Amino acid sequence: MDKKYYQLLKKQFSSKEAVLTEIINLSAICELPKATEHFMSDVHGEYDAFNHVLRNGSGSIKEKLRDCFPQFSSAEISSVATLIYYPQEKLDSECQLQDKKLFEHYCRLNLVYLLKTVKFVGQKYTRSKVRKAFPEKFRYILEELINEVDSTTDKQDYFDSILSQLQNLGELTRLIVALADTIRRLTVDHLHVVGDIYDRGPYPDKIIDRLINMPSVDVQWGNHDIVWMAAFSGSPLAMMNVIRICARYGNLDILEESYGINLRAILEYAERYYEPSEAFRPRLVDGVRLSADEKALLNKLQQTTAILQFKLESQLIERRPDFQLEHRDLLHFIDFSQNKIELAGETYDLIDFQAPTINPEQPASLTEEEEKIIAHLLNNFKTSDKLKRHVGFLQEKGAMYLSYNGNLLIHGCLPLHENGDFKSFTIDKKAYAGRDLLDFFDSEVRKCLAHPEESEDLATDLMWYLWVGECSSLFGKTAMTTFERYYIKDKSTHVEKKNPYYQLREQPKIITKILENFGLDENGHLVNGHTPIKEKNGENPIKADGKLIVIDGGFAKAYQKETGIAGYTLLYNSFGIQLVAHQPFSTVKAAVEKGTDIISLKRLVAEVDERKRVKDTNVGQTLLSEIADLEVLFEHYEDY
């Protein structure tokens, strides 16, 4: 490197000895055990279950407690674990159940347990990292308490006096909350969300707010995330799809209450033009209660947005011949006089097909009223401050894929031909396949996000292609049969044929080929979400001799009857990779009052021959590069 670089580097250190100290410090960090990574996918707005799995670290907290307190009964472990998961709620509950003296005893006793737990889970980190994990307000006092928690009788009075003073000042409960937060942070160092935060469940906004406040997180965009990002960034087609899905699952509150998007104009339009239809009956999860009028309105809104979606999609198909979606220009295949449609040479009756604003001569054209409604809604989406913040987070922390610590994370698939070759997508006479295809999509997504004022440019239209396109890594099927499922009785038309990837991913050589295409060796793993694993039918989420792990197991309540479980997560620590299968979450109240936890079953996916160190990770490679530069600076310090 040039002299100027080392001169700038030298300015960061007060002396040659300071450079040596930094070399020693970074070298020591490289020899520490690798921190724990936590993988989640397809959480689909299910905030309570998502939040609980985050808080219990997919069972990691209890595992640490059992190691730290081998003498404890399962009930005692459960009690301390609940305090770590939900400290404020647990303290409030205990305060109501006990008199003041007993509650103070409870706090002091459990504070000691938490101090010992922090000391235990912090063993594999530097003291500096543990210190930074503490809230600044309690940083000094917590360091003192942790150092003295196992003190001899010589220092017992010192330790007790600190606790007594904290108790007298009313700070004991706050310290417990701070310790619980620190334990959770140290138990899991980094979170990967492998796509699909949005749709189906009621609280995707809460999930993103939670992620924004996490110290270390990344996101691999899912198809349901992309369509929301597109709606914010100027795609009227994606926007109609977003509203339609919210209406389908009874989640208009996400739009109206969470994001402040005014739906009044389109709701009034829906009331005027449509009547309820059985195919558009809202799909409500157990426990959601709506009046007959509310259900009817959701039904009509879903029909409205579906027809507008099909009109806008027809326009996109016409202006983007490169997308090769002509077979999905369905409005032009309809015989409106006979109420029939011709698909692949077969003619089908349309059931309860209401299209009061479609002009059979120009089926894709919008009425003047529809154009005004769409323009108004687009403006509402673009000017939602909260949605802007959430999409900004997804842009900053997200990508089409991630190579991290030897593993490849992709939400859906890598499009393949039946022979295992990468399937290419051609745009403007240039073909993209494999990693190049995902890099191209990633670049276009960022172009779209940078120009929300554009509604019909290539980047914005590609966002829709990612939702429905045959070569989309986020979709990976020949067609999305939304129209057929609504209007055609023959279920053979509802089938969405998957890309060959989904059969070929059972083969180790295919996964090795994909890993190599992304610059990873055969010892890595490919982590997917997107397709729910039907465990109750015997489907195995671990495929290709352990090289591929699919972690969509049914966080979305709508899919739990199909999967038989309530989600998979993955843990990757210094000893190897574990897949965790979760049973459904009940409530925070039950967790606090009864100590109920998600029942989780762990399976070992891969065990390392030698314990992984920081130097074996992405972070470690950066540190080793820094050390090499510092060693050059140290050797030639006087020259710079």
UniProtKB/Swiss-Prot annotation:
Q: Give the GO biological process terms.
A: gluconeogenesis
Give the matching SUPFAM superfamilies: Metallo-dependent phosphatases
Query: Per UniProt, which keywords does this protein have?
Result: Carbohydrate metabolism, Hydrolase, Manganese
Q: In which pathway does it act?
A: Carbohydrate biosynthesis; gluconeogenesis
Catalyzed chemical reaction(s): beta-D-fructose 1,6-bisphosphate + H2O = beta-D-fructose 6-phosphate + phosphate
Which cofactors does the annotated protein need, by name?
Mn(2+)
One GO MF term on file is: fructose 1,6-bisphosphate 1-phosphatase activity
Look up the EC number in the record and give it: 3.1.3.11
Annotated family:
Belongs to the FBPase class 3 family.
Q: What is this protein called?
A: Fructose-1,6-bisphosphatase class 3
